[in-house]
Amino acid sequence: MKKTIMTRFGEVEFDPENTVLFVDGLIGFENLRDFIVMPNRKNGPLFWIQSVEEPDLAFVLTDPTNFFLDYKVVPDARERAKLGIGTDDDCHALAVVTVPPDRKVTLNLMAPVLFAPATNRAIQVVLEKSQYKTRHPLPA
């Protein structure tokens, strides 16, 4: 049965069976766990995740390999357990996008979102000893 929420994008209808469960929430938003994926109205590599519990909250995400071909995150056993997947299951690393007033877009490559399509679960992890930053600028 479809549900409807009022968001910054207007009224959005969604199927609760298709929500993405953020097992531990997102950093700073640990109490929010259910999100829906919303495509960007403009064609391109960016998309939105919209909180179901807090309709005013949405984040822009992207596949960082669109900009950094060598970016790779391999989930460890603990992370795979949280995602409910085995070693052979797909897991996508996504980056939270920041678009400040000066329009100098950055990606949070130090704390990627790991998404498991098989279970519709996601977690945000912090990479230790990373060469990347929380506000990593896009390549010129």
UniProtKB/Swiss-Prot annotation:
Record InterPro entries: Flagellar_assembly_factor_FliW, Flagellar_assmbl_FliW_dom_sf
Gene Ontology annotations for the cellular component aspect, listed alphabetically: cytoplasm
Compartments, as annotated in UniProt: Cytoplasm
Gene Ontology biological process: bacterial-type flagellum assembly; regulation of translation
Record has Cytoplasm as a keyword: yes
Domain of life: Bacteria
Keywords assigned by UniProt, alphabetized: Bacterial flagellum biogenesis, Chaperone, Cytoplasm, Translation regulation
Function as written in the Swiss-Prot or TrEMBL entry: Acts as an anti-CsrA protein, binds CsrA and prevents it from repressing translation of its target genes, one of which is flagellin. Binds to flagellin and participates in the assembly of the flagellum.
Assembly behavior: Interacts with translational regulator CsrA and flagellin(s).
Family statement: Belongs to the FliW family.
Protein name: Flagellar assembly factor FliW
Record organism: Syntrophotalea carbinolica (strain DSM 2380 / NBRC 103641 / GraBd1) (Pelobacter carbinolicus)
